[in-house]
Amino acid sequence: MMPAKKTARKRRVKKHVESGVAHIHSTFNNTLVMITDVQGNAVAWSSAGALGFKGSRKSTPFAAQMAAEAAAKSAMDQGMKHVEVSVKGPGAGRESAIRSLQATGLEITAIRDVTPVPHNGSRPPKRRRA
């Protein structure tokens, strides 16, 4: 039997991108932050779960803040300076993620809400009693 071939993982190429789009997807359970170039190719991403937050802590504004900070730092290492922000979803981490992006030093040029709104599609889940 032949020994298993080691497949070398492709090294991540540092892209030098000046401006891009920060996609913030904030759900009731988690917040995902992905920073892409203008064409939509991923430059950096992070999420509350990827940073080690588990369970109900993932859905907090603080977790969203940390996720946005981590993604922004990674993008700034690759030369990112200006971002447009597109926010999707009803979660708690929307505003804190935007503030965190600004605090890390990225210049925010525009903020868009791209939350999909159904034209009376499928029935929503039952109302939350919180």
Swiss-Prot record:
UniProt GO MF annotations: rRNA binding; structural constituent of ribosome
Single GO biological process annotation from the record: translation
Entry keywords, A to Z: Ribonucleoprotein, Ribosomal protein, RNA-binding, rRNA-binding
UniProt xrefs under Pfam families: Ribosomal_S11 (PF00411)
Region Disordered, residue ranges: 111-130
GO cellular component, one term: ribosome
Xref: PROSITE patterns: RIBOSOMAL_S11 (PS00054)
InterPro entries given in the database record: Ribosomal_uS11 (IPR001971), Ribosomal_uS11_bac-type (IPR019981), Ribosomal_uS11_CS (IPR018102), Ribosomal_uS11_sf (IPR036967)
HAMAP family listed in its UniProt record: Ribosomal_uS11
Job description of the protein: Located on the platform of the 30S subunit, it bridges several disparate RNA helices of the 16S rRNA. Forms part of the Shine-Dalgarno cleft in the 70S ribosome.
PANTHER family, per database record: 40S RIBOSOMAL PROTEIN S14/30S RIBOSOMAL PROTEIN S11
Similarity comment: family membership: Belongs to the universal ribosomal protein uS11 family.
UniProt subunit comment: Part of the 30S ribosomal subunit. Interacts with proteins S7 and S18. Binds to IF-3.
Protein name: Small ribosomal subunit protein uS11
Source organism (scientific name): Lactobacillus acidophilus (strain ATCC 700396 / NCK56 / N2 / NCFM)
High-level lineage: Bacteria, Bacillati, Bacillota, Bacilli, Lactobacillales
Gene name of the record: rpsK
